[in-house]
Design a protein with these regions (language model features):
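Beta-strand-enriched, solvent-exposed domains that form extended recognition/catalytic surfaces
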Residues: 269-442
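Surface-exposed binding patches on compact interaction domains or structured appendages
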Residues: 23, 27, 50-76
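Disordered, acidic Ser/Thr/Pro-rich linker "stalks" and the adjacent N-terminal cap
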Residues: 112-176, 189-196, 265-269
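Catalytic cores of extracellular degradative/oxidative enzymes
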Residues: 453-456, 463-697
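Trp- and acidic/polar-enriched beta-sheet ligand-binding modules for extracellular glycan
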Residues: 167-168, 193-266
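Active-site-proximal alpha-helical
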Residues: 622-811
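A short beta-strand micro-motif common to beta-rich folds, especially ectodomain repeats
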Residues: 86-98
Length: 869
């Protein structure tokens, strides 16, 4: 084997001055170590330790790779190259001949870092870049300044440049003296905003000496902030200019932070020793002599391990399925900004600071694949939003050998992100990935036994570990999993734990109608540990502080003893399913997601719903009408409407806000128009009562799928003919109105043309550009109309009694300031429209006593389920 040049490094094993002595002074310990630990890097070397002693002595190592040889005045220790991705240790024992004195030195050799010697691909810059349109301050030159925080953007505002098939944004990069371009990276804006992300773009190339452009293909990309790569089948040689025509961009804009033109730096000559293109095995007949001829340190390291049978491809080499993107499902479910798993390709690979070599194959030409490295622990532990949040570093991957440089100080776990933004994931072949120098952390999954998983958590390299169930991908501390993940009977319970979490999501998806209406995703949702706060809906999913792991990892606690933990998990996942504003109106952000919480604790077999007493008290408030008779209850929401009335542009609605000056809540029997609104009930838990009682009653009275149907109806709201769940035929008036208020100008135009005499049309109550924060009322009326059709009854009396429809103005602080503005004429028209459905025979009038029966209806209990382990 070809050896690196060795060197001599001396360590005096004594606390005395570094002078060689044959005999130590009387009373001095015969063998003293000045240092008990020594760390070296992965490269081969020979160490020498000077030993000064007044007795005869021996030296031995407990590992074969540390070879010791006595010298005249010490010991040589030969350490070969460490070809593994993990560090290794050996203990050197120095013993006196009589056995009475022993000193030890721990020698640690670092992991193989051959990838550090690999050159990274280079970028070449365009000499000039131009665009056919630019927003002032967002010039085309920003696409070649090397700064991801700056970007080029098409014009917006009054002079908006609308990107379309017939009006593409065109950017042209001119080159001078560039010989070769192997691939191009399109880097979208990195400020978290998706406006302008390229969604459909054509690349055209003009070579030196040519007069025209040649198309290199049209690419369809998801709008998700990830870097997109274009790699032509052959390098582009001597380019004169490269042009991009953007036919579709997010929000009808076009935006680019950087366009990187890259040249590969890796030669592939020595990689032909492998039998496959993923470099996971040597060709038959490869020998030590062949190994000695290799010069590429990475190839040499990998080949050495394979030749000696010490290299395992477990976790390091795997295939990763394509998934429909989280954004695709968010749009499909009308749940904007609420995302399922954004790091679906769990690898089990631990990434430390430095360079890493990754081979990737089979990325389709029109797709992009990224590697995300998430450091779940970043060295800071707090409890009141003062801890450390996960740090994500993202790398664009391409087919072939990728060299990434991970510069973050804290290690992370690696995830392959391979998503289709158009719902066509099933037609995509998997990509294959090999982390050549990856350190294995492993992950827990249903194909492993509990004993296998227990061993993984015990030997984890990373602070955290992934748990991959059928429905839920979660990340917890490795120590927490090892110590707290117990089954109901107290045994190791990883498999049962996955089944519990999977059941919670299955139940939520059932309530939402995903199974009934074929909306089940091919993507998991997420839960993860954090170091900053008790519980919240974070950037990846539901998150619990790590000090809560003894609760949320214990199956007996979840299933039998801790209804609150079930509520919390379901509550935060419920946020992912919230349909804003269709079923998430002003003041509803912490209410409608709790429909999922309620359903799941019932399905888990808990016999007392979390807020049963609150709902009983709410029923008394609604039915007995005593609480607000004193005239002393002031509505903060109405008060804020009055104080901020100048935010309302419509003259009549501004007058409504002005009329809220005294903000007093009245008793329903005295003034129903100014009675309590459901957003003004004592708490969000009380406000949920009206929904729960309605759901439970009709589930047991002829509408077993009431929730499934109303959710699907809302998902179909924006279809050309609206929902076909509760009705057949054309779009409903209030479906149009709801869509218009959300910002759909075409629906607003259709509404005005179809209903010219409506108060909404005549008084211009809707301004689509203002968005739904400007008024939740259209969404509320739309939902009441839908559920009335589903039940077969005109439900206006019930929802009026519960305060869903009041001719008042409210400005509700609910993750932003949201308005509720219902004028008298809006309410009157809605009641007339609902009465018309009764007159036509489509709906029935609620019989006497039904309102009270619904309001007082009990909970729906289930038998406690069992979960296999």
């Amino acid at each position: 084997m070809k050896k690196s040049v060795s060197f001599i490094w001396a360590l005096l094993l004594s606390s005395l001055p570094a002078a060689a002595q044959d005999v130590l002074p009387q009373g001095v310990t015969p063998l003293l170590l000045a240092a008990h630990n020594q760390t070296i890097d992965y490269q081969e070397r020979t160490l020498h330790f000077d030993v000064t002693a007044n007795v005869d002595w021996t030296c031995s190592a407990d590992q074969e790779w540390a070879q010791t040889t006595r010298s005249t005045n010490g010991v040589f220790v030969h350490v070969p190259t460490n070809y593994a991705s993990e560090s290794r240790t050996a203990t050197l024992s120095f013993k006196s001949a009589d056995g009475h004195t022993t000193q030890e030195l721990l020698l640690t050799q670092g992991p193989n870092n051959a990838a550090a010697n690999l050159p990274e691909d280079k970028t070449v810059k365009a000499s000039v870049v131009t665009a056919n349109n630019s927003q002032s301050g967002s010039a085309a030159s920003n696409m070649r300044d090397g700064d991801y925080s700056t970007f080029w953007h098409t014009a917006y505002g009054n002079n908006k440049f609308v990107v379309s098939e017939s009006n593409p944004a065109i950017i042209t990069f001119s080159f001078n003296g560039v010989e070769r371009i192997d691939y191009i990276n399109y880097v979208p804006r990195q400020d978290g905003t998706r406006n302008g992300d390229f969604k459909r773009v054509e690349m055209l190339v003009q070579l030196q000496g040519e007069s025209g452009y040649k198309s290199y293909g049209t690419f369809v990309w998801a709008s998700n902030g990830a870097t997109k790569s274009i790699e032509p089948s052959e390098p582009i040689l001597n380019p004169k200019s490269i042009q991009f025509k953007v036919y579709e961009g997010d929000g009808d804009f076009a935006c680019c932070a950087e366009m990187e033109f890259c040249v590969k730096s890796q030669g592939n000559a020595e990689y032909d020793i492998f039998s496959d293109d993923l470099y996971t095995a040597l060709k038959p007949g490869f020998t030590q002599a062949d190994l000695d001829l290799l010069t590429n340190p990475l190839v040499q390291s990998l080949a050495y391990q394979m030749l000696n049978g010490t290299y395992s491809t477990a976790y390091r080499a795997a295939s990763y399925e394509c998934h429909n993107s989280p954004q695709y499902y968010s749009n499909l479910w009308n749940a904007p900004g609420k995302y399922y798993d954004q790091i679906a390709g769990v690898t089990g690979i631990h990434i430390e600071k430095g360079k890493h070599a990754i081979v990737v194959r089979d990325i389709p030409a029109d797709m992009s694949v990224t590697l995300k490295v998430v450091a779940w622990y970043v060295g800071k532990d707090g409890g009141n939003f003062d801890g450390g949040n996960p740090n994500t570093t993202e790398f664009s991957l391409r087919n072939g050998l990728n060299v990434i440089n991970y510069t973050y100080d804290w290690p992370g776990l690696a995830y392959i992100c391979y998503y289709d933004g158009n719902g066509n994931s099933s037609s995509r072949a998997p990509v294959r990935v090999h982390f050549i120098n990856g350190v294995v952390n492993g992950y827990l999954s249903r194909d492993k036994s509990n004993d296998e998983m227990h061993e993984l958590t015990e030997n984890a390299v990373n602070t955290c570990m992934d748990v991959v169930g059928e429905k839920v991908h979660s990340v917890w501390t490795s120590k927490g999993l090892h110590n707290y993940c117990k089954s109901i009977d107290g045994k190791v319970g990883y498999r049962q734990y996955m089944n519990v979490l999977d059941s919670l999501i299955t139940w939520e998806q059932d309530l939402l109608g995903f199974y009934k209406y074929d909306r089940v995703p091919d993507l998991r949702t997420m839960a993860y540990t954090n170091y900053t706060y008790y519980m919240f809906q974070g950037g990846f999913g539901v998150s619990f502080h790590h000090d809560q792991e003894r609760r949320v990892l214990n199956c007996n606690t979840l299933v039998n003893n801790d209804e609150d933990a079930i509520w919390g998990l379901s509550h935060e996942w419920g946020h992912q399913h919230q349909m804003a504003p269709y079923f998430n109106w002003a003041g509803m952000s912490e209410i409608t997601n709790n429909m999922n919480s309620y359903y799941n604790i019932m399905r888990m077999g808990y016999k007392n719903s979390r807020d049963a007493n609150n709902w009983k008290n709410t029923a008394k408030i609604i039915l007995n009408d005593d609480t607000y008779k004193d005239g002393k209850h002031v509505s903060e929401h109405r008060k804020q409407a009055y104080l901020n009335r100048n935010e309302v542009s419509n003259v009549k609605l501004k007058a409504l806000a002005t009329s809220m000056k005294d903000s007093i809540i009245h008793a329903y029997s005295e003034n129903p128009d100014l009675a309590v609104a459901f957003q003004e009930l004592p708490s969000v838990d009380h406000s949920l009562g009206g929904f729960v009682r309605f759901y439970c009653y009709f589930r047991d009275h002829g509408c077993p799928d009431i929730a499934k149907d109303w959710y699907e109806s809302l998902r179909q709201n924006n279809n050309a003919n609206g929902s076909q769940v509760e009705k057949k035929g054309g779009v409903d008036k209030y479906e149009l109105l709801c869509s218009a208020q959300i910002g759909d100008n075409a629906k607003w135009t259709e509404f005005k043309q179809s209903y010219p005499q409506s108060v909404w049309t005549k008084n211009s109550y809707v301004t689509p550009s203002a968005g739904w924060y400007a008024n939740s009322v259209p969404a509320i009326l739309n939902w009441i109309r839908k559920v009335s059709r589903l039940t077969g009854y005109n439900m206006v009396p019930y929802f009026e009694k519960w305060g869903f429809i009041r001719p008042i103005a409210m400005r509700v602080g609910d993750y932003g300031n949201k308005w509720y503005l219902m004028s008298e004429d809006m309410l009157s028209e809605f009641k007339e429209d609902m009465d018309a459905l009764v007159d036509s025979g489509e709906l029935k009038v609620m019989p006497e006593g039904m309102l009270e029966d619904i309001t007082n209806y009990g909970d729906k209990y289930f038998t406690r389920p069992t979960f296999p382990n």
